[in-house]
Amino acid sequence: MNEHTTKRILVSSGSPYEPIIGFSRAVRVGNIVAVGGTTAGSGGKPVGIGDPAAQTRAILEIIAKALQDAGASLKHVIRTRTYLVDIAHWEAVGRVHGEFFGDIRPVSSMLQVTGFISPDWLVEIEADAVVPHFSA
């Protein structure tokens, strides 16, 4: 193994939960970038309360920034996983996902869960990306 396949790049979004729980917003190893479960928050406070589309937009902007900080972009995303507290929000969430990924078309899963840390969060999204060449 060489340095490019073993070097870990940790990306923080500044979430107050990162040091408490011990996680990174994203991790890059070689040409793989994994973005952890991302919710619509700013400074630890929920945004887009009651609006799953607004939350999805905020989440995907956070994910795009994390990817950028890891030397990747949305065009490198190969998989997303979307978790909803109410599956009835699938279309509103899906339409925003389509705005960001319409031409990229990663594989995607959408699941209903019982809840998140904050009851104001309606959506959480994870993303995996593959960058053609290591360039960090």
Model-found features: residue ranges?
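N-terminal presequence-like segments and the immediate start of the first folded domain
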Residues: 1-61, 65-78, 84-136
